[in-house]
């Protein structure tokens, strides 16, 4: 599965969200991690029959599409909020923004 963001980048966004209470980008990052886990599970799951194999391939394909969509969503929200995507540093304006608990 193609990955636009590596685990360290996603974790950095999540870590900053915990400190500064900017939960929305972190929620998207968590969803991306969960989709990656689901995809890996489906790819590695043992199949006892042709039907089982088809089920796992169907889930993996849908997960791959959802993952691509969520990575594009993350890119867009980081652009909108003004995150530095070379360092994944949260913009100063968001650090002062009161947020909702994660």
Task: Mark where each language-model region is.
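Amphipathic alpha-helical binding modules
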Residues: 60-102
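Generic serine detector
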Residues: 11, 47-49, 86
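Long acidic/polar interaction regions in large eukaryotic complex-forming proteins
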Residues: 1-11, 93-102
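N-terminal acidic leader/helix
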Residues: 5-42
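Secondary-structure edge/capping motif, primarily at the C-terminal ends of alpha-helices
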Residues: 17, 42-50, 77, 81
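Non-transmembrane, amphipathic alpha-helical segments
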Residues: 16-30, 48-65, 69
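Low-complexity, charged, repeat-rich alpha-helical/coil interaction segments
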Residues: 2, 30, 34, 40-41, ...
């Amino acid at each position: 599965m193609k990955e636009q963001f590596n685990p360290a980048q996603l974790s950095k966004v999540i870590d900053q969200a915990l400190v500064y209470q900017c939960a929305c980008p972190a929620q998207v990052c968590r969803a991306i991690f969960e989709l990656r886990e689901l995809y890996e599970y489906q790819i590695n799951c043992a199949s006892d029959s042709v039907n089982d194999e088809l089920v796992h391939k169907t889930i993996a394909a849908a997960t791959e599409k959802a993952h691509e969509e969520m990575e594009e969503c993350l890119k867009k929200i980081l652009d909108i909020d003004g995150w530095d995507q070379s360092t994944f540093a949260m913009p100063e304006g968001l650090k002062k923004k009161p947020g909702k608990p994660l």
